[in-house]
């Protein structure tokens, strides 16, 4: 972290890494563990409906390689298509993780696009917040929707950059920038990152962090890609803090003409 920077704070807890990672799509638990270590991430998200964190005693337990003592676990509601399913999944996560209250809410609209269903997302967020969950919420890149979720009490808003798993990168940087500039909670790009340059762009826009899974797990060398993403997030953040030069239509000479010898 740059000496010019301040740590990321989510739900009152401080983090030095602004890269958050998922646990799906890896070949095995060993690769999962090694990639997460290479990423330097401190927040690791887990799909409760697809991962074993103790509910299936006879199967490999993800918590054997991702200890709650080393990482902040972020249970998510991936695979939920209505508010009722999402709320039930968060309650299960709280039970399995001994009262853990930080969750990532995502309520999907359909299986083709995996875009969020905002009506169901609002309903689920309202219930979860009333039940004292700390909700980090997946949403689209609509600035109005993002602000509404913030005002409801979500502790972080996570707009998509592009469809989940698409690797298309930041499709609408202007909307992401608008969300960032109007927010008072952390804005974390979630979904659509494909390579290191995408992560850097998200950070250069002023996002507080980036969450990704497929971009690392689906790479030909996940461990190396995890390391690349770590560096990209750090470089993008430093570039944002440094302040880029303005874009110009015409050239601007690097060396002044005044004081030349001939």
Curated annotation (Swiss-Prot):
InterPro entries referenced in this protein's UniProt entry, alphabetically? Aldolase_TIM, Thiazole_synthase_ThiG, ThiG
Cellular localisation: Cytoplasm
What residues sit in the active site? 104 (schiff-base intermediate with dxp)
Q: Which domain of life is it from?
A: Bacteria
Per its record, the protein catalyses: [ThiS sulfur-carrier protein]-C-terminal-Gly-aminoethanethioate + 2-iminoacetate + 1-deoxy-D-xylulose 5-phosphate = [ThiS sulfur-carrier protein]-C-terminal Gly-Gly + 2-[(2R,5Z)-2-carboxy-4-methylthiazol-5(2H)-ylidene]ethyl phosphate + 2 H2O + H(+)
**One of the record's GO cellular component terms:** cytoplasm
Concerning SUPFAM superfamilies, the annotation shows: ThiG-like
Task: State the Gene3D superfamilies in the record.
Answer: Aldolase class I
Q: Does the keyword Cytoplasm apply?
A: yes
Q: Which EC number(s) does UniProt give? A: 2.8.1.10
Relate the assembly described in the record.
Homotetramer. Forms heterodimers with either ThiH or ThiS.
* Name of protein: Thiazole synthase
Origin species: Nitrosococcus oceani (strain ATCC 19707 / BCRC 17464 / JCM 30415 / NCIMB 11848 / C-107)
Could you read off the lineage of the organism from its UniProt record?
A: Bacteria, Pseudomonadati, Pseudomonadota, Gammaproteobacteria, Chromatiales
Please state the gene responsible for encoding this protein.
Answer: thiG
